[in-house]
Every structure is written in C-alpha cells, then in structure tokens.
C-alpha cells in the first residue's frame, strides 16, 4: 500500500538534507466475509481458537513482563461467564518505573529519522492487513462484543488507515519548511515533546487505542498506554504487532491500570508532556484539573487532547427522503448497540412525515437480531460492554417508563442473565428539553421529537442549544435552501456534520473525526494536521555570510 515518489532534488536545510517525498497510500478495503470466502474461513478458525480460552496479559515495561497482585479479568459482553483475558493493574511504583524508563529512551527515539519510525507503522499496518487480521478481529468480536462487520471496519481498515496515513503525514510534514533568505537557510525540525505522553484508551474501538498510543510514538514521543479493561485482549494484540514490527522497547509501555491511580501518577510527574484521551467527560475534566493544579511542577505545558462522546442528532426536514432517513437512523442508532461516540440518540421529525418514518423504523426494528455475534453472523448487534453500562442503560429505560413526557414505542427490555443484552429501543418524547434529549446514554436507545413541520427553523435552534455536546449530527433535506440554512444554524453543533447521511461511519483521511464543546478538543485524528499536535517544532537559522558590521545604515 506504500508507494513513495521522490522528487528530482534534495535541498540542504540547516542540519539536515530533506528529500522531497510524497507518500501514496489508500484506504484499506473493507472485506465482506461472505459464505465461502477466504477471510470468513480464517476468521471462523481464529474464533474457534479463542473459544472458552483465557489469555494472560501482563504489564510490559521495556522488554520486561510484570505481574502485580491486583488481578483483573476481561469478560465477554455476550457471555460474561467467559473470562477472555486475565490481566493485572500497574501500581504507582510500576507506573513511575515505566515513566523513568520511557524518559531515558526518549532522546534516541526522537533523533531517529521520521522515515525510519514511519516504516515501523507501515509494517504494522501490513501485518494487520494480512497475517494478523483474523486474530485482531476475533479478539475484538469476543472481547468487545462486536459483529463481524463492526469488528472489521474498526480493527482492520480504521486501524490500518491510522497507521498508514499518519506515517504518510509524518513523512510529508518534513517538507513543510520556512522560507530561506539571501545568505541564510531556515529549517523546521519537528521534534517530539520533551517528556512522555499518557494515552488513555476507550473500549469501543480497537483502532482508537492503537492511534492514541501510536501517533505520538510515530512523532518521536514515548508513551504510557493505558488500555481499556474491556478491550484488553485486542489492545494487547495491537501492542505486540507494533513490537513485532520493530518498535523498540520503552517507546510504548503497555500498562493496564486503575483509572484514578494512573491519572494521579502521570499528572504528578514533572515529565508529563501530553495526554491523549478518549473517554467520558468527567474523567477528562478530572485529568485536566489535575494538570492545572500541577502546572508549576512540569518542565513544559502539557498538551491535552481529548474526545468525550456526544448527544448526536438526526434532523429530518419535510423534503427528506424517508427511506434514507429510516435506513440511516437504524444503522446510526443501533449498530454496535449505540456504543459509538457518533451514534444518533436524538432525532427531530416533522409531523407530516412521522407516520411514514415511524412505520419504517418499526418495520426494520422487527427484523433486527440481537445476540451472539460469534455463533450467528446474522446478528445486527450484540450485548453492551459490561455490567456498569447495562445498569446505566437500564436506568434510562426505567426513566422512560416513568416520565409523563416519554413513550416507548419499541423495545425497552433488557436481560443480563448470560450477557448484557439490551433491546433496541425507540422512544417518543413530547418535551424536546427532556433530559433524555440532553445526556449521553451510550446504548441502543433512540428518542424522537415530533415537531410541526413549519417550525423547522426553531428546531434547528433547539438542536444547537439542547445538549452540551457537539460531536456529530446529520440533516436530511432534499431542499437545497434548507441545506444551506441548516449549515449556518448548526455550524457549531457538530464537529462531523453529515448531509443526507447517517451521523456515524467516519473514515480516516476522508472524514477526520472530532467535536468541540463538551465533546472534546477537536484535534481531528484521521486528518493531516493531527500529527503536528504531537510535535514541538524547532526553527534553526544558519547564516552563511559572516556578520561584519554592528552599525545600521541609518546610523551613518
């Protein structure tokens, strides 16, 4: 997938000679896993090899595998009697040891040419694309409860694309150089940050964990990677692939840990240079506050980047294509059980179209299969991730039953006897300000507000002001004037904004992802500028003509 085109010349730029190189990569194709296909046979074999087994996963500091006494287990969401992985939490002393070892390794890694670092990630991408694809997918399916297609788009193409495109952007960044002047040359050196980066990963995307740790490392940084407890198996597989691809020891430390212990330890280190985070708003705020409280101890101001979820909307105009609305909303709201940061959870429908859309949603709803994604590939989505998530969503379903403003029109049941299963649920609200339209649920729950069709301008204002989040949103008008009007009204309501398409499904290099407001710092991983976030540029001016006169001409 990598093709480098070298330009005809090389130019001397201060301390370095820069080759003008353009790197061509393409998005990794999504495989279909049809009956009888090679990829399906390989995946089924990988799933059989993991069935009923418990993987042992240590903390890894440098080349040392370390076990502590604080033992934990990752459970399969759809069969919580299956312990997918046995792992341990790093304690404060071990985390500090990891920091010390990382900082000691930083200088040599940072001085390595970016092209050499990039080749490690190109190789890792090729390994995931080829021989390790089935293994990483199988571990994502069993450990995180994903269906075949959801595991595929996450743990294969998205992760592969992160590695390849970020490597491409890192190499091409070297060509972004300042102007020279007569008698001198100017060079921009893209250094890593001075210190270490703490990467805090979520459960819902194997690719995000790999990117949170991988991109800072690619740019010359050393990283402490705290994987999610509920994505441990797939995360460890990605870590091992990076090491197999040539990543030196101590560049990424693999350190499962209790969240508060990890946060307290990294934010109290003078060497903290950055935090790369995906998770909840309360956790991100806690980390940010700890950084603020400790500013006086740091050698540098830490870079803090975070993505925190959303309360994503679908706005339907009276000119909408009904079938597109129904299909897009079902997929956005219920794929992976609504556990995507971009999932649609609030919908605004004009009264003139609601009967059609309602019936369309219910017709599809009856066909949705929720179950074991390993035993039945026709499953549309599986269980939610763990008992905490199940309890939280169950609480929202109970709220929907008791609220006078809410009516459950489909689903509403849940069962955690074998797995953490929640039915896809559609709720109608008569109050657009009801808290279910404001707060993130992170489950298969869609709430619909039906509005008078001529009040769509008021509804656009309502969408923009109802929720503190601003991650993704979609509008469904065929009327071009409404598309333009909505774009202005919702300019700040979503970092990823879709027109006549669902609010999920961003692709690396096509729709760089992220939002503002309570949704995060909107650094747009998957885009060309993301790598710059993890550099500390140095400008070097080298003068070739001796300076012989201290007086300025006007002084003559």
Swiss-Prot record:
Residues that hold substrate according to the record: 506
InterPro entries (UniProt xref): Ald_DH/histidinol_DH, Ald_DH_C, Ald_DH_CS_CYS, Ald_DH_CS_GLU, Ald_DH_N, Aldehyde_DH_dom, P5CDH/ALDH4A1
Q: Which Pfam families match?
A: Aldedh (PF00171)
Which reaction is recorded as catalysed by this protein?
L-glutamate 5-semialdehyde + NAD(+) + H2O = L-glutamate + NADH + 2 H(+)
MF terms in GO = 1-pyrroline-5-carboxylate dehydrogenase activity
Q: In which pathway does it act?
A: Amino-acid degradation; L-proline degradation into L-glutamate; L-glutamate from L-proline: step 2/2
- The UniProt entry annotates the active site at 307 (proton acceptor), 341 (nucleophile)
What is the superkingdom listed in this entry's lineage? Eukaryota
Which controlled-vocabulary keywords does the entry list? Mitochondrion, NAD, Oxidoreductase, Proline metabolism, Transit peptide
GO cellular component terms, alphabetically, are: mitochondrial matrix
Name a biological process GO annotation.
Answer: proline catabolic process to glutamate
Q: Where is this site: Transition state stabilizer?
A: 204
Q: Where found?
A: Mitochondrion matrix
> Quick check: keyword Cell membrane in the entry?
no
Gene3D superfamilies in the record, alphabetically?
Answer: Aldehyde Dehydrogenase, Chain A, domain 1, Aldehyde Dehydrogenase, Chain A, domain 2
Q: What is its EC number?
A: 1.2.1.88
Give first and last residue of the transit peptide.
1-17
Q: Which residues bind NAD(+)?
A: 226, 279-283, 440
Role played: Irreversible conversion of delta-1-pyrroline-5-carboxylate (P5C), derived either from proline or ornithine, to glutamate. This is a necessary step in the pathway interconnecting the urea and tricarboxylic acid cycles.
Which protein family is it in?
Belongs to the aldehyde dehydrogenase family.
Name the record gives this protein: Delta-1-pyrroline-5-carboxylate dehydrogenase, mitochondrial
């Amino acid at each position: 997938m990598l093709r480098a085109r070298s330009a005809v010349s090389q130019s001397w730029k201060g301390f370095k000679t820069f080759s003008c190189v353009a790197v061509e990569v393409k998005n990794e194709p999504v495989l279909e896993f049809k009956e009888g296909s090679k990829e399906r046979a390989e995946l089924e074999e990988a799933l059989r090899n993991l069935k009923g087994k418990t993987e042992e996963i240590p903390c890894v500091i440098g080349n040392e595998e370390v076990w502590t006494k604080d033992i934990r287990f990752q459970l399969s969401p759809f069969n919580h009697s299956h312990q997918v992985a046995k792992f341990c939490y790093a304690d404060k002393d071990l985390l500090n040891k990891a920091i010390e070892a990382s900082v000691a390794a930083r200088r040599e890694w940072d001085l390595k040419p970016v092209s050499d670092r990039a080749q490690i990630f190109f190789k890792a991408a090729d390994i995931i694309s080829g021989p390790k694809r089935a293994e990483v997918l199988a571990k994502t399916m069993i450990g995180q409860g994903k269906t075949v297609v959801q595991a595929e788009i996450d743990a294969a193409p998205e992760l592969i694309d992160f590695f390849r495109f970020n490597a491409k952007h890192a190499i091409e960044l070297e060509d972004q150089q300042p102007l020279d002047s007569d008698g001198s040359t100017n060079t921009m050196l893209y250094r890593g940050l001075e210190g270490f980066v703490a990467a805090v990963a979520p459960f819902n995307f194997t690719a995000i964990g790999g990117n949170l740790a991988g991109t800072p490392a690619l740019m010359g940084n050393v990283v402490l990677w705290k994987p999610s407890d509920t994505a441990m198996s797939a995360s460890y597989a990605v870590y091992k692939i990076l090491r197999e691809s040539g990543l030196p020891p101590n560049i990424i430390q693999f350190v499962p840990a209790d969240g508060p212990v990890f946060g307290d330890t990294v934010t109290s280190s003078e060497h903290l240079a950055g935090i790369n985070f995906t998770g909840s708003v309360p956790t991100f705020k806690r980390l940010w506050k700890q950084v603020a409280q400790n500013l006086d101890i740091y050698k540098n101001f830490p870079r803090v980047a975070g993505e925190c979820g959303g309360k994503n909307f679908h706005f339907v105009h009276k000119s909408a294509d009904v079938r597109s609305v129904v299909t897009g909303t079902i997929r956005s709201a219920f794929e992976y059980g609504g556990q995507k940061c971009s999932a649609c959870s609030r919908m605004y429908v004009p009264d003139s179209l609601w009967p059609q859309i309602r019936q369309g949603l219910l017709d599809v709803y009856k066909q949705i299969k929720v179950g074991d994604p390993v035993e039945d590939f026709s499953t549309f989505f599986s269980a939610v991730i763990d008992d905490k998530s199940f309890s939280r969503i169950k609480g929202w379903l109970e709220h929907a039953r008791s609220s006078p403003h809410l009516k459950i029109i489909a689903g509403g049941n849940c069962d955690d006897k074998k797995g953490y299963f929640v039915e896809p649920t559609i709720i109608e609200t008569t109050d657009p300000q009801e808290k279910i339209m404001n707060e993130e649920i992170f489950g298969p729950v869609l709430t619909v507000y039906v509005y008078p069709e001529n009040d769509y301008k008021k509804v656009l204002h309502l969408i923009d002001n109802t929720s503190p989040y601003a991650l993704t949103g979609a509008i469904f008008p065929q009327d071009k004037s409404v598309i333009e009007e909505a774009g202005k009204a919702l300019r700040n309501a979503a970092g990823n904004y879709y027109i006549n398409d669902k609010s999920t499904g961003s692709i690396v290099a096509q729709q760089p992802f992220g939002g503002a407001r309570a949704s995060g710092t909107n650094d747009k991983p998957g885009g060309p500028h993301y790598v710059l976030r993890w550099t500390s540029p140095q400008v070097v001016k080298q003068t070739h003509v001796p300076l012989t006169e201290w007086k300025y001409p006007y002084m003559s």
